[in-house]
Amino acid sequence: MQTSDTRALPLLCARSVYKQYSGVNVLKGIDFTLHQGEVHALLGGNGAGKSTLMKIIAGITPADSGTLEIGGNNYARLTPVHAHQLGIYLVPQEPLLFPSLSIKENILFGLAKKQLSMQKMKNLLAALGCQFDLHSLAGSLDVADRQMVEILRGLMRDSRILILDEPTASLTPAETERLFTRLQELLATGVGIVFISHKLPEIRQIADRISVMRDGTIALSGKTSELSTDDIIQAITPVVREKSLSASQKLWLELPGNRPQHAAGTPVLTLENLTGEGFRNVSLTLNAGEILGLAGLVGAGRTELAETLYGLRTLRGGRIMLNGNEINKLSTGERLLRGLVYLPEDRQSSGLNLDASLAWNVCALTHNLRGFWAKTAKDNATLERYRRALNIKFNQPEQAARTLSGGNQQKILIAKCLEASPQVLIVDEPTRGVDVSARNDIYQLLRSIAAQNVAVLLISSDLEEIELMADRVYVMHQGEIAHSALTGRDINVETIMRVAFGDSQRQEASC
């Protein structure tokens, strides 16, 4: 955090920035500043304009009007290359690495020869406490480590302005603390950080100033110490909410299709001594009508387990039983047809076709059941139903998924999974990068789905989310189930964290 009030000259000053898409005003005269050695947090609901503003600053998208003052010079527009030259680097919520290249190659990719310093990279790795095997493939990294590689790419370019988009969305509290420690070291060198997040406690911990965007404007801005939580929430909340379905319709949205019904409490998915990449000897039972939480530190094996259940990874041992039948040898498509549906952690690379229409994406898992060339009118009607149920904000069914904000993309992905009529729904970080209002919509929907006797496996790094939502909780530690299922009062953040660290062993993990 900023330690001196003498840093008067801003690193960045955006003035009167306007942007319009398809006749819709996305940014309406934004003013935004960032100083040396400070964290300026940017909050706002989905579609408030945060990502658009940051893309303009990073040179990805041009503004319609307005100026950017950087280093005392004014610019009407930037390109990504020019932004990098000026010391601006955007670390996206979904890190954009080359999975088939090594970590070292990813960090150095695109650098000019004069910037290709192995010693500099080693110094940065040491300063940030990272212990990567630089020769490992980037595709083997979890989300937390991919984010750190992105930050290292920016620092290798001598970036002075770092834009972090939801950097802690998939991190546990311990990993968040380690990230914040590293950010403090960067701030001490004069780097300025724009920190986009929906997590108010984290923002209060790390940010010097807060700006809240709503409907393309800055609705509130000030020093963190001078803004109350009520002020911030009120600024985020839309003045007028779109009229939606009634509470009962929204809460009890019926699943489509002729889905086999199970009585609540009936075992639907059983894992017997499962062993695979990143986990071993995992046994558990998931019952109809319950939300079973799966917690653990990043790297504990939760996502690897989920991908193995869905058939994306090879099973090395044990049995997967769905409705009493072994499905070890079934393909992903066959598991889907039997009602096993997976919502992946990384929505952009694994969940959505970003260039396809919203209607196509929502119905993507059911196209083969109706003939691949789906009926447009039916797809549009399906999309409209989920738009009302989840408050998805978009202009038209034909627009590409990549044009939506991150939170609305997540809602489209959830709709896609629900349209497949799941008996077992595995959701991996379902509220990652989603604002408070949308998060509550998703919570209501998951409860609604469980109330229809679907078995829900909830994987989340947000332990408060696990505590709020789960009926039972298993905790993974170093690839194994670390404890019998937690129930009742034992489902709390403190107990989950203790088990996640191997009971009382709170050893530090490397970056």
Swiss-Prot record:
InterPro entries in the cross-refs: AAA+_ATPase (IPR003593), ABC_carbohydrate_import_ATPase (IPR050107), ABC_transporter-like_ATP-bd (IPR003439), ABC_transporter-like_CS (IPR017871), P-loop_NTPase (IPR027417)
Residues that, per the record, bind ATP: G44, G45, N46, G47, A48, G49, K50, S51
Pfam families in the cross-refs: ABC_tran (PF00005)
Keywords of this entry: ATP-binding, Cell inner membrane, Cell membrane, Membrane, Nucleotide-binding, Repeat, Translocase, Transport
Entry's EC annotation: 7.6.2.13
Entry function: Part of the ABC transporter complex LsrABCD involved in autoinducer 2 (AI-2) import. Responsible for energy coupling to the transport system.
PANTHER family in UniProt: AUTOINDUCER 2 IMPORT ATP-BINDING PROTEIN LSRA, CARBOHYDRATE TRANSPORT ATP-BINDING PROTEIN MG119-RELATED
This protein's name: Autoinducer 2 import ATP-binding protein LsrA
Organism (species): Escherichia coli (strain ATCC 8739 / DSM 1576 / NBRC 3972 / NCIMB 8545 / WDCM 00012 / Crooks)
